[in-house]
Amino acid sequence: MEEKTHHHHHSTNKHIPSSKSRTPLLHKPYHHHVQTNPPPFLLHPSSHQNLNLVASNLPSSYYYYYYCYFYSQFHNSLPPPPPPHLLPLSPPLPPLLPLPPPHSMTRFHKSLPVSQVVERKQQHQQKKKIQVSNNKVSGSIAIEEAALVVAKRPDFGGQDGSVIYLLANHFLVKFDSSQRIYHYNVEISPQPSKEIARMIKQKLVETDRNSFSGVVPAFDGRQNIYSPVEFQGDRLEFFVNLPIPSCKAVMNYGDLREKQPQKKIEKLFRVNMKLVSKFDGKEQRKEGEDWAPLPPEYIHALDVILRENPMEKCTSIGRSFYSSSMGGSKEIGGGAVGLRGFFQSLRHTQQGLALNMDLSITAFHESIGVIAYLQKRLEFLTDLPRNKGRELSLEEKREVEKALKNIRVFVCHRETVQRYRVYGLTEEITENIWFPDREGKYLRLMSYFKDHYGYEIQFKNLPCLQISRARPCYLPMELCMICEGQKFLGKLSDDQAAKIMKMGCQKPNERKAIIDKVMTGSVGPSSGNQTREFNLEVSREMTLLKGRILQPPKLKLDRPRNLKESKVFKGTRIERWALMSIGGSSDQKSTIPKFINELTQKCEHLGVFLSKNTLSSTFFEPSHILNNISLLESKLKEIQRAASNNLQLIICVMEKKHKGYGDLKRISETRIGVVTQCCLYPNITKLSSQFVSNLALKINAKIGGSMTELYNSIPSHIPRLLRPDEPVIFMGADVTHPHPFDDCSPSVAAVVGSINWPEANRYVSRMRSQTHRQEIIQDLDLMVKELLDDFYKAVKKLPNRIIFFRDGVSETQFKKVLQEELQSIKTACSKFQDYNPSITFAVVQKRHHTRLFRCDPDHENIPPGTVVDTVITHPKEFDFYLCSHLGVKGTSRPTHYHILWDENEFTSDELQRLVYNLCYTFVRCTKPISIVPPAYYAHLAAYRGRLYIERSSESNGGSMNPSSVSRVGPPKTIPLPKLSDNVKNLMFYC
């Protein structure tokens, strides 16, 4: 039986020499007989078909390799070179027998005492990275910034599970690292749009080829040009006279009546180019390192080169490209169209540089007149052409400004190449607007357009568009058109989002075919001249790799796939509840008694007690109550008083989705202190069994119950690290930000923490508002401290380990998040005497574009439990892709887990098993979800906080003065309303 090893932070083994790296010395370059780390045959055993091993030489090479490994771990040095007859002719291990992970040696060689030395040494090396200051400054712990290194992979990948062969949408990029690249800075005046800038570059290449040494350079459309050869001079200046198509059309109340013949206006541009740097891609390793990424500037240059061809032919939005030539363009309503495109990104992987290519769908503004656009976008303006004299109320004006702000338009009353950005609306209606001319004489805007352009403005009572941030500059709405190629701003409606989702909901074989077509098509990254000129070769075949399918855990539920005969593991008792009907026809309202009966029966069947009678008769309210906050609050208080201020639940049946939903939640959870469950009349009228079951499960989860539990507790799955008597807390964190172009609303951070062990399926949450678009969680130390307090109250112990899952962090923010948020967690722990738990900090990424496809021809999604941690993952750091859910529609998207810090020293198998098992513990579902529950709960809680903020700010209104477009000073952070004590420890956000 293995000896228990307690992983305390202060544990050290002074007789073991320290090392600069956790990487075994054997894997560092050493003369001629040791492989560099990671040995490619260990990472990609299936890819080596020509091992050329001599049978007689295999055993000696094999055992010498293990001898080197244990010698290096015990002596902290390498053994002397072996005799010549023991030198391996090729990789010394058989292709399917990888080296055991370092700190799991006890499972393979229990008789070797060196295994304990290896484990303790690695524990010491990992934990010494944090230096705890004895002098507490401002209540925080000092963490040496230089010591914070992102966790390295602890082994060569997991071994558990059955093998599955997969294709990944990563395409290998081969390049000549000695190829020199010349970087030039470009300045164009007057400053053009991206489209015009590319036209300028194209004309220069055609007319002045000698200046560019006969090559076609790559241009990012802004200020950077990359060339495979040096131009004729370090500084170049050109003057380009470019004929630019003008925009003019005759308007008929917002619709194009006829398009004028397109004319071209000559415009002169000055182009200055300056050589900034020249570099190549040779690896720049630091002394003692066996791997280093390519220089960032080289990666950026390669990325621009590979984007050159699609940028010439498509509209680029971020890292994605869209074109109507790809098909799939579809109106989605509300003045928007869905457009199909593709995403591409260059990534460092274990197999080398790879191009991640995927299908992308997004919404664009429809290129129509502003009046026609508003008719489609805003329901209250559908009759605008028939009611030209209509004025806007203050609320309607606010909605119009919200719909148009930051959209680019062009005018249709004159020839022009100019585009304008909408910054707001005028205070006055068009009829009342006057403006000064160059001589200071005031002119009436309507008279000006009639005298100069012969156009009589029709919509006199609408405001004008304000098209300058700094000074008054107005355009009548009816004379403006929406420019093409603009991504839809703001939040899509539920109907629009559903249509976009449907456009992107391709079966795996369909998605794969689209990606393959892009790679071989004319808009693909390898179809232009740049790849040839820069000596690049992009594979047109997806990456073949081996994944593994993990075994699902057994649950404490008889039939997890059939709710008809199953009961929840923990059912709650709901004795005091009420029902509130908001809106609805008389026929819909008549279904309420049947709905109550069906719901109570279903709850009883599931093991949830819901009293068959509400505390009072149903409260029927008109739908406009959701528009009146004070009236809504008064009614909710009345319902609470009817229950003697002891209500557990209010079920709210609504006629349709309404923005007042946010007010209902905020008032109920912060002012009244009661959990609510909302549903729609169309659903309760149909009253399907599945709908009622899901509703009952949500209610049970919110009031304190849970659907299921792991049959074998979490510690039993990882006995090396976890024990029932040493509790562990699982935490999740997320930050939500305002919609694009909202430049003042605060961001909302949420942190959740488990409060039971070893079940670990009940969570409490904490939410805070913070600085506008601040990704780092500012009050993390306070929230973690509160969650640890809650854990202690529930479990009577502080957790020995903290497993922290952080959602919503991009790769560029990894080090900053690790540095600041790990410090915050440590600071929270320091508030407790002699408390120093082991911490694992993992980032959870769902918004990525890696997709995995089966190799077999059945075209189904990959099965739940599919994990990949080789070939397409990071070359050195600890990450893996896990598809934990069953993909029913579209193509499954695996979740990417990247471990930034690991004092618990998980092996790949252990952490993957833990995450997969946790995905079965979601509180209101019997099937595994796609993302680890703590991260998902944090996302839901942050969204709830965002709802509070948005409704509060909308209720307070805003200034319509165009001068307010230029905000002075930093935006104020609106504090979140405090949760009621009755609600804050419940999972009300589920």
Swiss-Prot record:
Residues 379-484 form the PAZ domain. Belongs to the argonaute family. Ago subfamily. GO terms for biological process: defense response to virus; lsiRNA processing; miRNA-mediated gene silencing by inhibition of translation; miRNA-mediated post-transcriptional gene silencing; regulation of development, heterochronic; ta-siRNA processing; vegetative phase change. Residues 1-25, 953-973 are annotated as: Disordered. Keywords: Plant defense, Repressor, Ribonucleoprotein, RNA-binding, RNA-mediated gene silencing, Transcription, Transcription regulation, Translation regulation. Expressed in leaves and floral buds, and at low levels in roots. InterPro entries: ArgoL1 (IPR014811), ArgoL2 (IPR032472), Argonaute_N (IPR032474), PAZ_dom (IPR003100), PAZ_dom_sf (IPR036085), Piwi (IPR003165), Piwi_ago-like (IPR045246), RNaseH-like_sf (IPR012337). It comes from Arabidopsis thaliana (Mouse-ear cress). One of its GO terms (cellular component) is ribonucleoprotein complex. Involved in RNA-mediated post-transcriptional gene silencing (PTGS). Main component of the RNA-induced silencing complex (RISC) that binds to a short guide RNA such as a microRNA (miRNA) or small interfering RNA (siRNA). RISC uses the mature miRNA or siRNA as a guide for slicer-directed cleavage of homologous mRNAs to repress gene expression. Required for the processing of 21 nucleotide trans-acting siRNAs (ta-siRNAs) derived from TAS3a transcripts. Associates preferentially with the microRNA (miRNA) miR390 which guides the cleavage of TAS3 precursor RNA. One of its GO terms (molecular function) is RNA binding. Residues 954-966 have a biased composition (Polar residues). Residues 1-13 have a biased composition (Basic residues). This is Protein argonaute 7. Disruption phenotype: First leaves are elongated and curl downward. Increased number of hydathodes per leaf. Accelerated appearance of abaxial trichomes. Presence of stigmatic tissue in the middle of the septum at the apical end of the carpels. CDD domains: PAZ_argonaute_like, Piwi_ago-like. Residues 649-950 form the Piwi domain. It comes from the Eukaryota.
